[in-house]
Regions:
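An acidic/histidine-cluster motif and surrounding catalytic segment
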Residues: 1-98, 102-244
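A short, hydrophobic C-terminal helix/tail in secreted or cell-surface proteins
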Residues: 245-249
Length: 249
């Protein structure tokens, strides 16, 4: 493996909590190797809920959410589990939540460091989405999140917003998803829509790993967004860390 000369850009990143299913050890290995390559040690694995063969009704409080697959339920509850675990076991002001298909390769193209990024975050943020799958024009400046900025592959969340999500959607060791999240209680809508959420695509996602929830989306949506962002970063490498509603493609 080649020597990574860009590790300094991610110095002081963390704490990271990455979600991984027990039934996907190959993804755990991928993440552990990724962190080692980038010299990241401030991370912890969170065992996710697997909705592929179980409807997960036993971990829900209240009605089963409408128009959601068991895979989507597993994704949402796994994120709530990770957020709750961080909130209750750490006193850090924020956490970085990752799924086990995150891709850090474009960090090589950054013209800034993680510390630079943290220093320029908006004063009023609750969540900042750091990986984006978009069905429309891509926005590469830090912007208020658009409705078609999809993906919970990676985001940073503060304690205030974590407390709100736990209060609304966690009941002991169970989860409540029937309390009016619009349009559905999928992870994107539940986490992002209930707070002041910004977005900027400074990380990617490993399309080669596919999708455990929506495999049909990989070719239809994920690859086009991935390719567009990869091309932009490799050709420009400049991320404008101020808020903007203008499209930069």
């Amino acid at each position: 493996m080649d020597k990574n000369k860009s590790t300094f850009k991610l110095k002081n990143i963390g704490p990271i909590y990455y979600i991984n299913l027990d039934g996907q050890p190959e993804r755990k290995e991928y993440m552990e190797d990724l962190f080692k390559y980038w010299e990241i040690d401030n991370y912890e694995r969170v065992s996710g809920y697997d909705g592929r063969d179980d409807d997960l009704s036993d971990i829900l409080k209240g009605r089963y959410p409408e128009q959601m697959t068991s895979g989507e339920v597993g994704c949402t509850t796994s994120h709530l589990k990770a957020i709750k675990h961080w909130y209750e076991t750490s006193d850090t002001p924020y956490a970085i939540i990752m799924e086990d298909d995150i891709d850090l390769d474009i960090v090589r193209c950054w013209n800034f460091t993680w510390s630079n990024f943290i220093a320029k975050m908006p004063y009023d943020w609750d969540v900042i989405q750091l990986a984006i799958i978009c069905t429309g024009g891509l926005h590469v400046t830090l912007h208020k999140r658009f409705v078609n900025d999809f993906s919970t592959a990676c985001y940073i969340i503060n304690r205030h917003h974590a407390e709100k999500l736990i209060r609304l959607h966690v009941r002991g060791d169970k989860y409540k998803l029937d309390n009016g999240v619009k349009p559905r209680a999928v992870a994107d809508d539940l986490i992002y829509n209930s707070g002041n959420t910004y977005a900027v695509p400074i990380f990617l996602y490993k399309v080669q790993l596919g999708s455990s929830i929506h495999p049909e989306h990989v070719d239809a949506i994920h690859k086009a967004s991935y390719n567009a962002l990869t091309n932009w970063w490799t050709q420009s490498g400049i991320c404008l860390l101020y808020t903007s509603d203008a499209a930069d493609e």
